[in-house]
C-alpha cells in the first residue's frame, strides 16, 4: 500500500509513472485490529479511510462497507479489492501469516464481499495472506474462494 500511495523508493513508488498511483482518499482498509507502527504511519494523516473492528462492532458491517465503497469509488471508474485473510478471525481462517483473535466472522466477511459485489463498482479482486502451511484442512483457502464467489455474485437465493 505505501508504494501505491507514493511512499518509499521512487523506483517502486513511481513505477507506473504517476505518484501516487492511487489517491489516498480512494483507499479504504476495513477490519483493522492489530496495526504495527509502520502501518499506523501509512494510515494516519494520509486521507486513507481506516475502519477498525470497533467501527464494525459499533456501526455494523453494512454501514462500514457502504462508506468504504463510497470512498473507493468517488471519482473513479471502479476499484480493486485486496482481501487480506488476516482480517478474518483465526477460528475461521487459521491459515494466515498473522493470526490475531477478534477478527471478522464468517458471515461478516461474506456480507462485506456481497455488498462490494452488489455495488457494481468492483473492477478486480484478489485474496492475499493465505499460508497453506498454517492452514487446517484447507479451511482458509476454501473460505477465500467462497469470498471471491460472494464478490462475483454468488448468493444464498
Task: List each language-model region with its residue ranges.
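Active-site glycine-rich loop that binds ribose-phosphate moieties when present
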Residues: 2-37, 63
Amino acid at each position: 500500500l505505501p508504494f501505491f500511495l507514493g511512499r518509499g523508493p521512487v523506483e517502486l513508488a513511481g513505477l507506473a509513472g504517476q505518484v501516487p498511483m492511487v489517491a489516498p482518499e480512494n483507499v479504504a482498509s476495513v477490519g483493522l485490529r492489530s496495526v504495527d507502527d509502520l502501518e499506523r504511519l501509512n494510515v494516519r494523516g494520509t486521507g486513507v479511510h481506516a475502519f477498525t473492528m470497533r467501527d464494525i462492532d459499533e456501526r455494523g458491517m453494512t454501514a462500514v462497507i457502504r462508506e468504504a465503497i463510497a470512498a473507493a469509488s468517488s471519482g473513479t471508474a471502479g476499484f480493486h479489492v485486496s482481501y487480506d485473510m488476516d482480517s478474518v478471525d483465526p477460528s475461521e481462517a487459521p491459515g494466515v501469516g498473522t493470526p490475531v483473535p477478534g477478527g471478522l466472522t464468517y458471515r461478516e466477511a461474506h456480507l462485506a464481499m456481497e455488498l462490494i459485489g452488489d455495488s457494481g463498482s468492483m473492477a478486480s479482486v484478489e485474496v492475499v495472506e493465505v499460508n497453506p502451511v498454517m492452514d487446517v484442512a484447507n479451511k482458509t483457502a476454501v473460505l477465500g474462494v467462497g469470498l471471491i464467489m460472494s464478490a462475483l455474485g454468488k448468493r444464498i437465493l
